[in-house]
């Protein structure tokens, strides 16, 4: 059967003609483009080679008559000759490594060029070593202003005895080649480039739709970006308390900026969104608010698990997970796998270990509890987790994580008529502990405990420090700290004479950096040679020693034609530009926050008070 099209093997070694992965003995590799070809799928005319190395049909430029008809992809002979000539030029370039040759061949075969290199890549190439094409490792600067790795320079100048710059062919003095000095300013430049790269990668281009708290309405609202209407897709309303998301314990009066009373036990809200606005429980769907490395701040009893047992002053709580929520499911009553102490479950166990107080809210959805509110969501104070374990759930197939919560609040519970809060009480008897696995009981003293002297619950140890920046001033301080680090590194590029940022920097053979104007002004009026005479008799001229301002190195030869370090100059200009942009962004933020908000909604004290109605027993 006639083969009309000749195709090579792809990157996985599969022949693009017969779709077979041939063994190595049935393939031929082109000596020019290093592409494997399947021998049985090649025409006999293509197997003939007049030279020692076999060339594929694409590189040989020979058009086989049987492959010409019907092949619209056939390369014209003129373009094929140009392509082959370019590939042979790459192969003959001894300055390139095999990896670089392969990269250039691939770019040439795919039709790519240097136009595809982005601006950031071009900026990186400006500080690359011209020998190894990498960021300079222990960079040194030649008197002509070009930068190299110390290892590459020693291999070039000392190992091969070449005393000319490989870029501009300027002569390299022997004392520079014998004792090259590392350019510390360029080391700082590379370090700063790496810091900038990490920060750019960390802050990837992602659009954040931010609404300042003072511009939010008092109730949850649906934005135009919401997929569906309703509270499930609603954005949160204004936050009325100034606590961070990882705040532990009760919400005190100093964090209630409007009422100055804090969040009281028994306050109720219409739904979880309003509860979120007052900080009692931030997640509007999840039942646990916490972080596995910090602890759990609050939980919600909303009837999500049949295993939960509510006894008011204490209750048994079930962890999260183990249910199939694929297909965009929000809830699923059936357990499909074992729960494990990780993520939110681990945060509850950490709160048990440290003895942190956990805020508890009860929802009207908890139909099986006599202590749940008839409607809405109610804040019932803080509890402490005394024990945690795993056990087979009521569905009888999979293990669930279990937690024993005991109330420890200074305010009385909403269902009691007591005038005082809780007192330390003995732990209840839990029958399922007899078959429990992975039982954990706190051994150290709890962080939140009852003080007998004061007769109240309080922090006996320092509460966990918040990891979430809440104050805008704190955020600006953090941003200024990052910019200060850049400014500190920018000081590395200061002239050793004027102590200002380098302008037209020149690097001496002793690796010190100066402004070109400062260095020339330092030795202005000093000639290279000093004429001497004695009693009217002319003596041999003596060379003037021009000592470096920072060391004892003679710069007389270097000062004959000092070259500006263009790479360093461009780096300094880029850093200056980024500093100016950062300062401008901070000043804009300060101006915006100093102006009155465009939308400021007055809070009605009556409505606020109504949203936090106190329920009696």
Curated annotation (Swiss-Prot):
<feature type="domain" description="YDG">
    <location>
        <begin position="258"/>
        <end position="407"/>
    </location>
</feature>
<dbReference type="GO" id="GO:0010428">
    <property type="term" value="F:methyl-CpNpG binding"/>
</dbReference>
<dbReference type="GO" id="GO:0010429">
    <property type="term" value="F:methyl-CpNpN binding"/>
</dbReference>
<dbReference type="InterPro" id="IPR011011">
    <property type="entry name" value="Znf_FYVE_PHD"/>
</dbReference>
<dbReference type="InterPro" id="IPR013083">
    <property type="entry name" value="Znf_RING/FYVE/PHD"/>
</dbReference>
<dbReference type="InterPro" id="IPR027370">
    <property type="entry name" value="Znf-RING_euk"/>
</dbReference>
<keyword id="KW-0862">Zinc</keyword>
<dbReference type="GO" id="GO:0044027">
    <property type="term" value="P:negative regulation of gene expression via chromosomal CpG island methylation"/>
</dbReference>
<keyword id="KW-0479">Metal-binding</keyword>
<keyword id="KW-0808">Transferase</keyword>
<dbReference type="InterPro" id="IPR017907">
    <property type="entry name" value="Znf_RING_CS"/>
</dbReference>
<feature type="zinc finger region" description="RING-type 2">
    <location>
        <begin position="495"/>
        <end position="552"/>
    </location>
</feature>
<protein>
    <recommendedName>
        <fullName>E3 ubiquitin-protein ligase ORTHRUS 1</fullName>
        <ecNumber>2.3.2.27</ecNumber>
    </recommendedName>
</protein>
<feature type="region of interest" description="Disordered">
    <location>
        <begin position="575"/>
        <end position="617"/>
    </location>
</feature>
<dbReference type="InterPro" id="IPR015947">
    <property type="entry name" value="PUA-like_sf"/>
</dbReference>
<dbReference type="InterPro" id="IPR001841">
    <property type="entry name" value="Znf_RING"/>
</dbReference>
<dbReference type="Pfam" id="PF13445">
    <property type="entry name" value="zf-RING_UBOX"/>
</dbReference>
<dbReference type="GO" id="GO:0008327">
    <property type="term" value="F:methyl-CpG binding"/>
</dbReference>
<feature type="coiled-coil region">
    <location>
        <begin position="563"/>
        <end position="593"/>
    </location>
</feature>
<keyword id="KW-0833">Ubl conjugation pathway</keyword>
<feature type="compositionally biased region" description="Acidic residues">
    <location>
        <begin position="580"/>
        <end position="595"/>
    </location>
</feature>
<dbReference type="GO" id="GO:0042393">
    <property type="term" value="F:histone binding"/>
</dbReference>
<dbReference type="InterPro" id="IPR047529">
    <property type="entry name" value="RING-HC_ORTHRUS_rpt2"/>
</dbReference>
<dbReference type="GO" id="GO:0016567">
    <property type="term" value="P:protein ubiquitination"/>
</dbReference>
<comment type="function">
    <text>E3 ubiquitin-protein ligase. Participates in CpG methylation-dependent transcriptional regulation and epigenetic transcriptional silencing. Mediates ubiquitination with the E2 ubiquitin-conjugating enzymes UBC11, UBC8 and UBC8 homologs (e.g. UBC10, UBC11, UBC28 and UBC29) but not with UBC27, UBC30, UBC32, UBC34 and UBC36. Promotes methylation-mediated gene silencing leading, for example, to early flowering. Can bind to CpG, CpNpG, and CpNpN DNA motifs, with a strong preference for methylated forms, and with highest affinity for CpG substrate.</text>
</comment>
<dbReference type="GO" id="GO:0005634">
    <property type="term" value="C:nucleus"/>
</dbReference>
<dbReference type="InterPro" id="IPR045134">
    <property type="entry name" value="UHRF1/2-like"/>
</dbReference>
<keyword id="KW-0175">Coiled coil</keyword>
<dbReference type="InterPro" id="IPR036987">
    <property type="entry name" value="SRA-YDG_sf"/>
</dbReference>
<keyword id="KW-0156">Chromatin regulator</keyword>
<keyword id="KW-0238">DNA-binding</keyword>
<dbReference type="GO" id="GO:0004842">
    <property type="term" value="F:ubiquitin-protein transferase activity"/>
</dbReference>
<feature type="compositionally biased region" description="Polar residues">
    <location>
        <begin position="604"/>
        <end position="617"/>
    </location>
</feature>
<keyword id="KW-0539">Nucleus</keyword>
<keyword id="KW-0677">Repeat</keyword>
<dbReference type="Pfam" id="PF02182">
    <property type="entry name" value="SAD_SRA"/>
</dbReference>
<dbReference type="Pfam" id="PF13920">
    <property type="entry name" value="zf-C3HC4_3"/>
</dbReference>
<dbReference type="InterPro" id="IPR047498">
    <property type="entry name" value="RING-HC_ORTHRUS_rpt1"/>
</dbReference>
<keyword id="KW-0863">Zinc-finger</keyword>
<dbReference type="InterPro" id="IPR001965">
    <property type="entry name" value="Znf_PHD"/>
</dbReference>
<feature type="zinc finger region" description="PHD-type">
    <location>
        <begin position="12"/>
        <end position="62"/>
    </location>
</feature>
<dbReference type="GO" id="GO:0008270">
    <property type="term" value="F:zinc ion binding"/>
</dbReference>
